[in-house]
Amino acid sequence: MPHSMPPAPAPIWLVQSRLSPFPGTAVANWLFDEGSLTRRLTRLSHNAFSVTPLVQEWQTLRNDECAALGLPEQSEGWVREVYLRGHGQAWVFARSVAARSALLEGGLNIDELGSRSLGELLFCDQAFTRQPIEVCRYPRHWLPAAVADNGLWGRRSRFDRGPLSLLVAEIFLPSLWTAIDARPEAC
């Protein structure tokens, strides 16, 4: 008889003031930077930045996402998963979600972004308000198999504009830290 494993617990997302132990300075600098990650990655890559869409579809949102968006568990929403790349290397895995009802009311065509960065949209539209950044060690089983690793730092923020809330999670992959070590002046 096969033995089934219990589901892995969801991570505990924490704001900066509640985080302990605190990551090193270089990691914290990237985790808690409130500017555009797209712009920062573009600068680090000397404009060799690109976005590779992995998933763009309606799905049942994870319970931690529903809680962050103030939705009932098992709510349906738009899920967009991408790699943010520098020089063709996946530096960041990003997952953005929004409730179906909020997207319909909010007038944002997130499903039409394709290979464009969501960050461009969020930081160019001054009507969006960013909520506090939360961080965690992102669960390996939530990552694409090609980059699945234990203990990777992730961050997330909710961006609000009227009835629309988008939850954006960004997981920093080992290749990013390698690039930062090679080009500290570009950070």
UniProtKB/Swiss-Prot annotation:
Function, in words: Removes the pyruvyl group from chorismate, with concomitant aromatization of the ring, to provide 4-hydroxybenzoate (4HB) for the ubiquinone pathway.
Reactions it catalyzes: chorismate = 4-hydroxybenzoate + pyruvate
Binding residue positions for substrate: R80, L118, E170
Record-linked SUPFAM superfamilies: Chorismate lyase-like (SSF64288)
Gene Ontology CC entries for this record: cytosol
Subcellular locations according to the entry: Cytoplasm
Single GO MF annotation: chorismate lyase activity
Family in the record: Belongs to the UbiC family.
Entry's Gene Ontology BP terms: pyruvate biosynthetic process; ubiquinone biosynthetic process
Pathway assigned to this chain's UniProt record: Cofactor biosynthesis; ubiquinone biosynthesis
Keywords: Cytoplasm, Lyase, Pyruvate, Ubiquinone biosynthesis
KW rRNA-binding (keyword) present: no
A Pfam match: Chor_lyase
Main location: cytoplasm
Official protein name in the record: Probable chorismate pyruvate-lyase
Record EC number: 4.1.3.40
The keyword Cytoplasm belongs to this UniProt entry's keyword annotation: yes
